[in-house]
């Protein structure tokens, strides 16, 4: 949610942000109109209520000949107060509905355009020349099957399309990768949290995921009425809902480990083979609560953390600055790290990090106490540190001619010192 005072004073900035996102500019005018109606309706109600109280005080002390008139006036005014109250409540509801539709204000530096209008910030790592090495690279699913590590067929049998089993050394590789990510996060001052994967509607709405991505989210209907999270960002944002934080000693940094669930409603025909786009996966997510003035520095820190982790798994990658039209409603700016996938001949997203400024905090009522005793909204940021999809890039970029997988050096201590995953026949 945005600051209404900012919208009143800088409507042109908010409209420009909406335009860059490809969203309704007229919504800003709707917010301002409903805000004016809300304030005037509330003023009428409060004036009538004050008059009602004043007359009520006079009734007890009034002479008998005036008391009847005052009582009649009180009854008449009571009806008006009820009408003004109903009008004020309706105006407040209309205002709130409009406000919650507005997306966060895009940072001026974010590129204009849509999904394909990102800007490449830099590329890191050398892309392998498999032709020079004398063999055609296999895709991650073929490799995973070859080491008895990825079983899509039985996953589909059990859970339906886009489900899978990770087994043996590939399952160990995922645990190793996620554990390595947690260790790195803790070294940088993050606190590990195993988070809920079911959240209340108010928390899901507060983080902004029910705006344009509601169809991507699994929902449990009544009597539960809860949502399955697609990232631990949701639970970590909701953890301090309705709280006043102390950020005088620096940002609060969390590292969430959870299973995640996504419907992939708009993914028909996309990535139907393998584990790039699935309904369930595991992820380590960074989440930060920071002072408003520190959010940009923290965003750079999260991106550096992601790069450090990508360096450990030794895959070529690039960083892109996501265009405004491809940002989620909560993000003011977002950077993606995309790894090279040899068999696809292109980069695929492995991580993203977003600065959500005060947008989520206002919706969830998360504030900090200032030196003067007043409170203000904090900034929230998030970034992926490792997730199941990383296995795709690791398997393909570290494959050997015989179908074995060389384990990245940094991961070997997490896999008992093992250096290579050898081809293995399925035992069952």
From Swiss-Prot:
EC code: 6.1.1.11
Residues the entry annotates as binding ATP: 262-264, 278, 349-352
SUPFAM superfamilies noted in UniProt: Class II aaRS and biotin synthetases (SSF55681), tRNA-binding arm (SSF46589)
Keyword Transcription regulation: no
Domain topic, free-text comment: Consists of two distinct domains, a catalytic core and a N-terminal extension that is involved in tRNA binding.
Subunit structure: Homodimer. The tRNA molecule binds across the dimer.
Protein name: Serine--tRNA ligase
